[in-house]
From Swiss-Prot:
Protein name as it appears in the record: Peptidyl-tRNA hydrolase
UniProt superkingdom: Bacteria
Record site: Stabilizes the basic form of H active site to accept a proton: 93
Xref: Pfam families: Pept_tRNA_hydro
Role: Hydrolyzes ribosome-free peptidyl-tRNAs (with 1 or more amino acids incorporated), which drop off the ribosome during protein synthesis, or as a result of ribosome stalling. Catalyzes the release of premature peptidyl moieties from peptidyl-tRNA molecules trapped in stalled 50S ribosomal subunits, and thus maintains levels of free tRNAs and 50S ribosomes.
GO biological process terms held by the UniProt record: protein quality control for misfolded or incompletely synthesized proteins; rescue of stalled ribosome
Site (Discriminates between blocked and unblocked aminoacyl-tRNA): residue numbering on this chain: 10
One Gene Ontology term, aspect cellular component: cytoplasm
Assigned protein family: Belongs to the PTH family.
Source organism: Paracidovorax citrulli (strain AAC00-1) (Acidovorax citrulli)
Length: 213
């Protein structure tokens, strides 16, 4: 089961609504669902909450180290409570996924994401779960730094919030250790709305009788 849920972002009001803080938004939603409150914990360099799920302690963490040093916070809590990498899930913004979509995976590269890069280094392993929350790509690599530190458009914000709400429905499966089910739930999007029935074709007039012409 997942014992440590981490959301990545940058601390402070200047960053609250930026794309890079999508991971924080996800943890905020999970905290609401579990009815716990995040509080500052200096020992773990972040905002922390503890939930009890079926007699098991589960931790929620928002590192307050700024993105590039996220691993310092994650490793501090994980090592103290002897949580293994495969028992950790990190929710983060993902450039290569469109707004409105999210993907769940275990392991793999950090793909240039500086928060993941530091978690890799501090844990000494890439073998943790990632919930990749789509924020879209600006289309030009040189614009990425500005893109992630800006607020999404209202339409994109709604799409991101929708994907967060949808992926949070997989949290019970994550807590139960059924990651196959969790993956299926995250990756299964809402079915398209059925198309309205086509109007019935207008009746074809019968040909006039010879005597009627």
């Amino acid at each position: 089961m997942i014992k440590l849920f981490v959301g990545l972002g940058n601390p402070g009001p200047d960053y609250d609504a930026t794309r890079h803080n999508a991971g924080f938004w996800w943890i905020d939603g999970l905290a609401r669902d579990l009815k716990v409150h995040l509080v500052p914990e200096r020992a773990y360099h972040g905002l922390v909450a503890r939930a009890n799920v079926n007699g098991q302690s589960v931790w929620l963490l928002q590192p307050q180290t700024f993105m590039n040093l996220s691993g310092k916070s994650v490793a501090a809590l994980a090592r103290f409570f002897k949580i293994q990498p495969q028992e950790i899930l990190v929710a983060h913004d993902e450039l290569d996924i469109l707004p409105g979509q999210a993907k769940l995976k275990r392991g793999g590269s950090h793909a240039g994401h500086n928060g993941l890069r530091d978690i890799h280094a501090q844990l000494g392993s890439p073998d943790y779960w990632r919930l990749r929350i789509g924020i879209g790509h600006p289309g030009v690599k040189a614009e990425v730094a500005n893109w992630v530190l800006k607020k999404p458009s209202p339409d994109h914000r709604t799409l991101i919030e929708d994907s967060i709400a949808h992926s949070l429905k997989a949290a019970p499966a994550m807590l139960a250790g059924d990651m196959d089910k969790a993956t299926l739930l995250v990756h299964t999007t809402k079915p398209p709305r059925p198309k309205p029935p086509r109007p019935a074709a207008a009746p074809v007039d019968a040909p006039a009788a010879p005597g009627d012409q």
